[in-house]
């Protein structure tokens, strides 16, 4: 496609720019509506008989111009510039200073302090908070988002459910440039602000505590969740700790089929199933010296079964999280996440997103390793 240069000479427009202009024109004319998926790089290469490198350049130009949003594993979608009006453009309707908070659940061992911190930050900034719990269900998470959007919230703080698939409704919010901050569980590869813990480093340090004590036959224990980022990061940190000692973690010792700590499968029925699984595992693997549990409640199940079998020894279980202590010592050596900081920073990031300010994409809150014998004196 030739066009006139500055002095009237003809110059050839690069193929990638021709493709870029064509798709941009289609977006502006409504051929591709906001939120609609556009052809992939491979499709464009076939359509225009060009290399994938050429089509990739065109897609990059569209993304850099904020005309499309690229979601790994999902495709590229037309960004909706009109879907979200910033607070300063809104009138003062009741919903304009509401923040939607969606958690998959919370307990004394985790998330209560996050929630309190978000609430305090909302009050400090003159916002109100509306809370919904998804109970670990993608459908309930979607319903909560729809309900709160209809209620008029101007942004979301979301603890995504444990699932290998990302919630399509959250991805739609991203495409629409609706302010969203995720906490605890990161949507890797998706351009969404995140506040949480460096689970790889925390797990690596916690496992190193056991290895330093001389333990080698260590069982990694996690729920039977899908390949969620948080759990996979903790598993990876566990493996890295072994590598630090020139060792390889024995996956035959791992327990990864428990489900009673997941929100959608809580209850006595599932708890008894998990106890039976652990009991059998202990009988089959008498060589296990210690356990690294990815969650506090899994550590409680392990302790119960070990005591029942007469095999429990002090400090043979480490875990993530634990109830806040008051004049007492920790039941297990564990990772204490910076919940209050996570809550405060998630609100700060959300407000920056709402007002269109520059903000970091990822914030890692500090954590601590609390030894079993340490006391919290308030």
Which sequence ranges carry the predicted segments?
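Extreme N-terminal segment that seeds HTH/winged-HTH DNA-binding domains in transcriptional regulators
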Residues: 1-47, 85-91
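Periplasmic-binding protein-like
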Residues: 100, 153-160, 219-222, 285-295, ...
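Flexible loop/hinge segments that line or gate small-molecule binding clefts
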Residues: 159-205, 321-332
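Hydrophobic alpha-helical segments within soluble ligand-binding/sensing domains
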Residues: 193-220, 240, 271-279, 337-355
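N-terminal helix-turn-helix
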Residues: 36-70
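Amphipathic helical "hinge" segments at domain boundaries
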Residues: 17, 84-154
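Flexible loop/turn connectors
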Residues: 22, 279-378
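An alpha-beta-alpha
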Residues: 206-247, 359-376
């Amino acid at each position: 496609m030739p066009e006139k240069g500055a002095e009237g000479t003809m110059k050839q427009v690069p193929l990638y720019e021709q493709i870029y202009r064509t798709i941009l024109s289609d977006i502006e004319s409504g051929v591709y509506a906001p939120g609609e998926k556009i052809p992939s790089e491979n499709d464009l290469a076939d359509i225009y008989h060009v290399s994938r490198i050429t089509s990739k350049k065109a897609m990059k130009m569209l993304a850099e111009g904020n005309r499309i949003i690229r979601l790994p594993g999902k495709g590229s979608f037309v960004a909706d510039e009109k879907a979200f009006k910033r607070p300063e453009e809104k009138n003062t309707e009741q919903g304009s200073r509401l923040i939607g908070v969606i958690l998959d659940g919370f307990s004394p061992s985790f998330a209560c302090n996050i929630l309190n911190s978000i609430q305090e930050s909302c009050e400090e900034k003159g916002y109100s908070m509306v809370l919904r719990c998804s109970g670990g269900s993608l459908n309930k998470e979607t319903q909560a988002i729809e309900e709160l959007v209809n209620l008029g919230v101007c942004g979301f703080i979301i603890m995504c459910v444990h699932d290998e698939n990302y919630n399509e409704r959250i991805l739609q919010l991203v495409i629409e440039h609706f302010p969203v901050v995720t906490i605890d569980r990161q949507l890797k590869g998706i351009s969404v602000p995140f506040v949480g813990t460096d689970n790889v480093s925390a797990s690596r340090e916690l496992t190193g505590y056991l290895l330093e004590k001389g333990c080698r036959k260590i069982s990694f224990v996690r729920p039977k969740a899908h390949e969620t980022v948080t759990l996979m990061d903790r598993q990876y940190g566990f493996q890295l700790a072994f590598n630090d000692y020139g060792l390889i973690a024995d996956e035959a010792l791992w327990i990864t089929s428990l489900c009673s700590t997941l929100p959608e499968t809580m209850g006595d029925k599932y708890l008894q199933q998990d106890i039976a699984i652990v009991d059998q595992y202990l009988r089959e693997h008498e060589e296990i010296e210690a356990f690294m549990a990815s969650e506090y409640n899994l550590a409680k199940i392990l302790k119960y079964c070990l005591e029942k079998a007469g095999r429990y020894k002090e400090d043979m279980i480490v875990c993530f999280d634990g109830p806040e202590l008051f004049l007492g010592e920790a039941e297990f050596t564990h990772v204490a996440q910076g919940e209050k900081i996570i809550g405060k920073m998630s609100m700060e990031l959300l407000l920056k997103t709402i007002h269109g300010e520059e903000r970091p994409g990822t914030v890692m809150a500090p954590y601590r390793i609390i030894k079993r014998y340490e006391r919290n004196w308030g």
